[in-house]
Amino acid sequence: MMGTEAVVADLMSIDPVVVRPDTTIEEAERLLQEFDITGMPVVDDEGRPVGVISQTDLLTTMRPAIGVLIRAKASGLRVGELMSTPAITVPIATPLVEAARQMLDARVHRLVVIDDRGRAVGVLSATDFVTLYADG
C-alpha cells in the first residue's frame, strides 16, 4: 500500500475520457459503455472541467419510463442539461489523504484531477481507493 505521502498523481487514471456540454446524451452513454466507466468529466473548449456526467445522472433522468428515454434521445438532449455541476476538482499534487477527505465531504464518487492551468488530466475515483486498499 502507498504511504501517507502518496499524492493524487500516484493513483489517478490518466488521459480521462471527456465530453463537452453540447455532446448528446446518446453519445455520452455510448462512451460510458465503450470505456466501461461510470462517469466522466465535462470540459470546456480549453479542457477545463465544468461538470461531470455519470450513470447516476442518466438513470435519475431516465427512470420514470422507457418512453422518457426514447423521447430524450429523439429530442437531442445534451450533456450540459443533465451534468452535475460544478465538477469537484483536485490538483494533481494533492496528498491522497486530502483527496479522500474531499471526496467524502463532497459526497462524490470521483474527483477530476487538474493541472496547474486548470485542465482535466485525470480522474480519481472511489474505486481507485478500494483497489489500493484491496491490493494492500
How does the language model describe each region?
Residues 1-15, 54-89, 95-108, 120, ...:
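Tandem CBS (Bateman) regulatory domains
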Residues 19-36, 43, 89-107, 114-115, ...:
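The conserved cystathionine-beta-synthase
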Residues 32-35, 40-56, 103, 111-127:
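A glycine-centered beta-loop-beta connector
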